[in-house]
Amino acid sequence: MDYNKVTEWYLKIRDDFKVYTYYVGYDPWNANYWIDQMKEIGFDMIQVRQGAQTMSNPMKQLEADLIDKKVIYNNNPVLKWCLLNTSVFRDTNDNIRPIKGQKQRARIDGAVSLIIAYCVLFEKYNDYINLQGGRAKDE
């Protein structure tokens, strides 16, 4: 993966479209250079470990929001494909995390990215509410 391309994408949506990313969630595995690069530019990086304890509640909420059609993804075919490729691992404590299904070569990266975004939302929910003028979007 070319992390420079990812950084360029974040800068492009900020500079060209005035979309300001308050937090960027990331999996710490093999991303040290990119994390430092993004911090130097001014992005607030939030580490999200890809384990059941970390991802369980956000993943369950994402599932509920997808069912309730609260997630707008414009029927993106790549994200839809990644979501369809994603299966659930459940531990003995009923915590869940995403895994690849039977097709081990299939990609789940888009689904995992969305779950990471939900993990950041869970961690920074009060900041999100403040950005919305003190109330949740669906109130």
Task: Give the role of each language-model region.
Residues 54-63:
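Short, charged, surface-exposed secondary-structure boundary motifs
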